[in-house]
Amino acid sequence: KALSDISRWKRIVSLKKANLVVSRRFDLSAKGTKFLAFFSSTPIFGVDMWSVKGFNDDDAKIFALWFNSTLNLLQLLVHRTETRGAWIKLHEYQIRNSMMLNPKTLTEQEKYALLDLFERLKKQKFPSVLEQLRDRFWARVEIDKAILKVLGFNEQETNQLLDYLYPALTKEIEQLKT
């Protein structure tokens, strides 16, 4: 019996492994919440994570940047399933119905810029999401500027948008906390 259970679990884990995983349930106000999505060149299986399959490594890296961007965070807050306080539960239909950056529509130059950014930031230590927003953490700003640039925003529009979004989202998350 034990061997069949192990075999069954191996099959389950094998089916769920992916190089991109997205948090299914998280507390945006928690000090430990630093990212919402994670890339691994070796397929992984995360507890309470959505496994996102079917993408090559480059596209998965671009999606990881997107899922961790402030635009995606805004989208999550607007369409969230609130559980308690700043806890958010992300359902599969929310991922499927959300707006996403499409790597297939990017130019080679845009892809290169995003992949270069990913490589530069992949070992960078990040504070919590709330601290990133409140303190305009430089790496979050770089991610957001890169995402907004490939979406067609110019520098002035980007700065105006981020000047509005960072304090607004900080306030929203802090209010959810109470």
Mark where each language-model region is.
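Polybasic, glycine- and aromatic-enriched phosphate-binding surface used to engage nucleic acids
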Residues: 1-116
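Non-catalytic DNA-recognition/assembly elements of restriction-modification systems
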Residues: 104-178
